[in-house]
Amino acid sequence: MPQSSPSAAATASDMDKNSGSNSSSASSGSSKGQQPPRSASAGPAGESKPKSDGKNSNGSKRYNRKREPSYPKNENFSNQSRRSNSQKSKTFNKMPPQRGGGSSKPFSSSSNGGRRDEVAEAQRAEFSPAQFSGPKKINLNHLLNFTFEPRGQAGHFEGSGHGGWGKRNKWGHKPFNKELFLQANCQFVVSEDQDYAAHFADPDTLVNWDFVEQVRICSHEVPSCPICLYPPTAAKITRCGHIFCWACILHYLSLSEKTWSKCPICYSSVHKKDLKSVVATESRQYAVGDTITMQLMKREKGVLVALPKSKWVNVDHPINLGDEQLSQYSKLLLASKEQVLHRVVLEEKGALEQQLAEEKHTPESCFIEAAIQEVKIREEALSGVAGGGGEVTGVVAALEHLVLMAPLATESAFQPRKGVLEYLSAFDDEAAQVCSLDPPGPLALPLVEEEEAVSEPEACEDAEVADDSLGEGTVGPEMSQEEPITKPGFTQLSSSPCYYFYQAEDGQHMFLHPVNVRCLVREYGSLEQSPEKISATVVEIAGYSMSEDVRQRHRYLSHLPLTCEFSICELALQPPVVSKETLEMFSDDIEKRKRQRQKKAREERRRERRIEMEENKRQGRYPEVHIPLENLQQFPAFNSYTCPSDSALGPTSTEGHGALSLSPLSRSPGSHADFLLTPLSPTASQGSPSFCVGSLEDDSPFLSFAQMLRVGKAKADGWPKTAPKKDDNSLVPPAPVDSDGESDNSDRVPVPSFQNSFSQAIEAAFMKLDTPATSDPLSEDRGGKKRKRQKQKLLFSTSVVHTK
C-alpha cells in the first residue's frame, strides 16, 4: 500500500493538469487522501485514458460500471458503505473524482458532492428497495398523509339511517350492526312505564336495552345452547343475539377475571347485566309444494302496525302483552310489573328449580343456585313495586283519562271549518283539497268508498314496482285497465289511505307475489274486495332483506325495519279463488316465470355437477365413460328373421336346412355384430334361397369388405329383410344438449361436432348401399354378356388434398 501512493499522486496531478481548473489543489488534496484504496484495484492511470475518450467520456456512471465491473466507481454503490464516515465530518469529502469526466464537468467533485448525493438519493427512491443491498434508508414522506377508514366505521353516514353517499352512489355501504339486526327480527316485551312514541314514527329506532324484559324469537328450529349443546334452560340472550343457558353463561363469565367476557361465538363483549330473558317459538318452514294460507292485511299510512282486515282496529300505542289475537303483529308488547312477574320471572324460577333437582350432584349445581338467587332478587324487586304502586297507578290512569278527554271538548269549538289544505303523514308527500264539511250525512259513505278506491291503485302500483324490482315480470296492459276503479263522481282524497296486502296466517313475514296480486285485482276489482284468506300451493319462495332501495320499491312494506328478513311467495291460484279467464289472461307471465325457474334450476344443477367434478378431480376420481346403447339404429339388436320363401318350399326344405339355422344364444357377442353386418353372396342366395340366416362360400360364411362393395347392389336379393321405417329426420342431428345431458329448450342451432358428422356420413353411405338399383346386374349375365366392373363408390372423404 505505501508503494502505490506515488503513482496515485502522479495520476491525480496529471488529471489536474488536463482539467485546467483553478480548484486543482483542493481536488488533488482530497484525491490524495483516498487514492491509495482506489489505486490498488484501478491499475495504471494510462490504461484508463483511452477508455474514457470514447462514448463514455461524458462521465456516465452507468456505462462505467457496466464496462468495468471491478472498478467501484458508481456513486450509488460506493457511497453506501462510506456513508457513516461522511456523516461524521461534513467538510471532509472522500468521494473520488470521476475518471475521464473532469474536462466535461463544469464543477469539481469536492464542491458539489452534496448535490450528487441528493441526485443519488432521488434515483434510489425511484426504485424498489430490493434492488439495492446493504443498509439503506427509504424516503417514506409520501405516507405521512395516508389515512384509511377502519372497517365498520360509520363516519360518513348521517343520522337519517342511511349513508349520504350510499343513496346517490351504489358503492356506498352501511356497516352491519348486530343489535339492529336483532331488533329488526325479534319481538320485545318492554315495561309499560316508558314512552315509545318514537318507535311508532320510525321503524328503525332501536329499543333501549334496559327497558327490555323479554325477547321473543320466531325461528324454524329450536335453538340450542352453544356451550352444553342442549335446548337452553331458563335461556338468556346477549346483545349480540346469541342464546345460552343461564347456568352455562354464568359459568362462562366466572372464568374471566374481569366483569365481562367475550362472546364464545362472535367475540363481542358480554356483560352480566345485559343478559335478557328469551323465549324461542318454532314456526313452520314452508317449502315449494306445500299449502299455505294467507290472510288479507290492512295498514294505514304512517302507522307501523299491520293487522288483519277482519280484526283491524286503530292502533296508536303498542299492543299489550295480554292481547293474544293481536300480539303477534306488533314489534313491541307492553307488560306491567305483574305480567312480567308471572309470565317471565316465575317461569324461569320453575325451570331452574327443576334443573337443580336433576343436576343437584353435578359441578354445575353451584351456577344453577346462583341463577336461582338472581331470580329471587328480581322477583322481590318486582313484587315490591307491584304491591306499593297501586295508588300511583290509579292516579296515572286518572290523569291519562283527563288528557284523552280534553281534545274531544276542544275539537267541537272548531267544527264549522271550511276547506283547507291538509297533508298526509310523513310517509307520503301528496296533498289533497278537503271539501266542505257542512253536509256530513251524504258524504259519509262516499268517503269510505273513496278511501278504498285511493288505497287500492297505490297497492297495485306497489305490486307493479315490486314485480319490476324483482326482475321477474313486467307490468302488462291489464293494470292500466284497472286504474279507473274509483267512482267518477268522487274526488280522490283520503285523510288516511290504507295499504292492503296478503301475509302468512301465522304471522311470518311471507307476502304474496305481485303476479298473484294482479290476478286477484283483476278478479275482484281491488284487494279490499278480495277474500280475507286464500289457500294455495307454494310455487316459489324468494328471500330478501329490507334495505332503503327495497323499502322505496315496496312501499306497502315500509313498516318493516332495516335488515328485517322477509319472503315473497308465489302461489298457484286455482279456479275456486280466481276464474279460468283470469288465469288465461296472465298465462304469459306465469309461463315466463315458470321457464325462469326451470332455467335457474338447470343452472344450479350444472353448477353443482361442475363443483362435484372439480372436487373429484382433486381427489383423483374421474367420471366413468358412459356409452348409451339405446340407439337401435347404430346398435341393432339380434332378431331372428323369417324368410318369405319358407312357406313355398314346404316343411321338407325347412327341415333339411334346419341345421344351419342359428339361435340367438348360439353365437358369441362378438359374432353377432359380424353376422349382422355381413350380407350373403349372390351365389349362395341364388342356389339356396331358403338360407335366411347365412351361407358358406369358399369355406367361409362371411365376405370381405371389398367383396361386399363389389356385390353391394345384389345384396338386396340375397338378404331378405324388412326395411326399417326411417323418419325424415333420421340423419338430422339430435336436439342440442349441454354437457350435463340436459336440453336447453331453445331454438339455437349448435355447431356440428366432428364425431356426429362422421358417423352420420358413414351411416348415409351404408344406407345408399342398402337401396336396390333400378337395373338388375344379374340380367346381363343371363344374356351372355360379360359383366362390367362396377365403379368404386366413395364412402367418406375428409376433403384433405394430399400432394406428392
UniProtKB/Swiss-Prot annotation:
Q: Where is the composition biased (Basic and acidic residues)?
A: 114-124, 601-611, 715-729
Query: What are the GO cellular component annotations?
Result: cytoplasm; nucleus
Does this UniProt record's set of keywords contain NAD? no
EC number of the protein = 2.3.2.27
Question: Which Pfam family name is an example for this entry?
Answer: zf-C3HC4
Matching Gene3D superfamilies, A to Z?
Answer: Zinc/RING finger domain, C3HC4 (zinc finger)
Into which EC class is this enzyme placed? transferase
Q: Where are the zinc fingers (RING-type)?
A: 225-267
Q: Which domain of life is it from?
A: Eukaryota
Keywords, A to Z? Cytoplasm, DNA-binding, Metal-binding, Nucleus, Phosphoprotein, Transcription, Transcription regulation, Transferase, Ubl conjugation pathway, Zinc, Zinc-finger
Region called Disordered, residue ranges: 1-134, 589-611, 646-665, 715-804
**Record-listed Phosphoserine modification sites:** 5, 110, 128
Q: Which SUPFAM superfamilies match?
A: RING/U-box (SSF57850)
| Listed Low complexity bias regions | 1-31, 78-90, 104-113
In its UniProt record, a GO molecular function of this protein is: ubiquitin protein ligase activity
> What is catalyzed by this enzyme?
S-ubiquitinyl-[E2 ubiquitin-conjugating enzyme]-L-cysteine + [acceptor protein]-L-lysine = [E2 ubiquitin-conjugating enzyme]-L-cysteine + N(6)-ubiquitinyl-[acceptor protein]-L-lysine
Query: Where located?
Result: Cytoplasm; Nucleus
One BP annotation, GO: positive regulation of myelination
Q: Where is the composition biased (Polar residues)?
A: 646-655, 795-804
What pathway is it annotated to? Protein modification; protein ubiquitination
Protein transport as a keyword? no
State the protein's purpose: E3 ubiquitin-protein ligase that catalyzes monoubiquitination of 40S ribosomal proteins RPS2/us5 and RPS3/us3 in response to ribosome stalling. Part of a ribosome quality control that takes place when ribosomes have stalled during translation initiation (iRQC): RNF10 acts by mediating monoubiquitination of RPS2/us5 and RPS3/us3, promoting their degradation by the proteasome. Also promotes ubiquitination of 40S ribosomal proteins in response to ribosome stalling during translation elongation. The action of RNF10 in iRQC is counteracted by USP10.
Q: Which family does it belong to?
A: Belongs to the RNF10 family.
Describe, as the record does, how this protein assembles with itself and its partners. Answer: Interacts with MEOX2.
This protein is called E3 ubiquitin-protein ligase RNF10
